[in-house]
Amino acid sequence: MTAYFAFFAIMHSILADPRFKTWAGKRFGNVFDRWQRLAYTVLALIMILPFIYIFVSLPDRILYIVSWPGMGLTAACQALAAIALLAALRQTGITYFLGLEQIKRASAPGGLVTSGFYCHHRNPLFFFAALFLWLSPIMTLNLLAFNILATVYFYIGALHEEQSLMAEFGPEYEAYKKRVPMFLPRLKC
C-alpha cells in the first residue's frame, strides 16, 4: 500500500509542478493549457482505483470503534468536515478545480481567493479532508496507515501548491502567507 501511495503521490506532484506545466505548455501549446487540469483530475481518479483495490484487499484489523454517543458525535463532525470541504471547493470554483473552466478558455480567470474559509487558513481543502479522515469513528490498521500517508501527502502537497501560488501571485501571496496560517485555522479574519 505504501509503495503504490508513494508512486501516486510522486506522479501527482510531478504533474502539478509548475516546471512540468511550463515544459509541457511550450511543447504542446494551447491544447495543453486547455486540457491539462481535466486530464490531471481524470488521471488522479484512474490512479486511485488500484489503490482502493489494494486498500480493501489487504488483511486488516480493527484498532478501535468509538462507542455511542461518541460514534454519533464523530460521525456528525465528519459530516460537517465533508460539508466544509465541499463549501471550500465551491468557493475555489468547482469547475475550475476539475479543469472544466480551462477547456472554455486556456487562461481561465482565477484570482487569489482570500475570503471565506481562505481567510482563516490557507489550505482549507487539505485541512477539511484530513479532518474528515481522522474523525472516522472506526479505525482499522489499514485506515490508520492510509490516514498517515494522506496527511503527509496533504502537507507536502500544500507546500508544493504554495510554490505555485507564489510563482503566480508573487507579493500578493507573500502578504497573504504572512497574515494567514497554513493549516490550523485562526478564529478571526
Which positions does each model-derived feature cover?
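Juxtamembrane "helix exit" motif at the C-terminal ends of alpha-helical transmembrane segments
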Residues: 50-63, 136-139
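Juxtamembrane helix-capping/reentrant segments at transmembrane boundaries
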Residues: 24-43, 68, 103-114
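A generic, lipid-embedded transmembrane alpha helix
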Residues: 39-55
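Membrane-interface loop-to-helix entry segments
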Residues: 39-41, 72-82, 115-128
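Transmembrane alpha-helical segments that form the membrane-embedded catalytic/substrate-channel core
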Residues: 4-18, 50, 54, 78-100, ...
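Non-cytosolic membrane-interface motifs at loop->transmembrane helix junctions
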Residues: 62-73
